[in-house]
């Protein structure tokens, strides 16, 4: 009976840890999804600003 209790306690403990890790990973994924649009905006700005600067310099330079 004592070994059964130890086994059950071990299974419960490992299951709790596994559930906790999965929950943390899921929360991290949700945070990543929330961050993506902002990161995309920054990437687009990085691509567009040099293009516009070059375009304006060509227009104003001529």
Curated annotation (Swiss-Prot):
Q: Which domain of life is it from?
A: Eukaryota
Q: Which GO terms describe its biological process?
A: defense response
Q: Indicate where this protein resides in the cell.
A: Secreted
Where is it expressed, tissue-wise? Answer: Expressed by the skin glands.
Q: Which keywords does this Swiss-Prot/TrEMBL entry list? A: Amidation, Amphibian defense peptide, Antimicrobial, Cleavage on pair of basic residues, Secreted, Signal
Q: Where the protein is mainly located, per its record?
A: secreted
What span is annotated as the signal peptide, if there is one?
Answer: 1-22
Give the InterPro entries listed for this entry. Frog_antimicrobial_propeptide (IPR004275)
Q: List the disulfide bonds.
A: none
Residues with the modification Leucine amide, per the entry, are: 60
- Cellular component GO terms held in the UniProt record: extracellular region
Cite a single Pfam family from the UniProt record. Answer: FSAP_sig_propep
Pro-peptide region(s): 23-45, 61
The UniProt family comment states:
Belongs to the frog skin active peptide (FSAP) family. Brevinin subfamily.
Sum up the protein's function in the record's words.
Answer: Antimicrobial peptide.
The protein's name = Pelophylaxin-4
């Amino acid at each position: 009976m004592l070994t059964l209790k130890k086994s059950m306690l071990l299974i419960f403990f490992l299951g709790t840890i596994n559930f906790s890790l999965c929950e943390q990973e899921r929360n991290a994924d949700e945070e990543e999804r929330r961050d993506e649009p902002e990161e995309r905006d920054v990437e687009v700005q990085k691509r567009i600003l040099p293009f516009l600067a070059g375009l304006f310099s060509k227009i104003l330079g001529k």
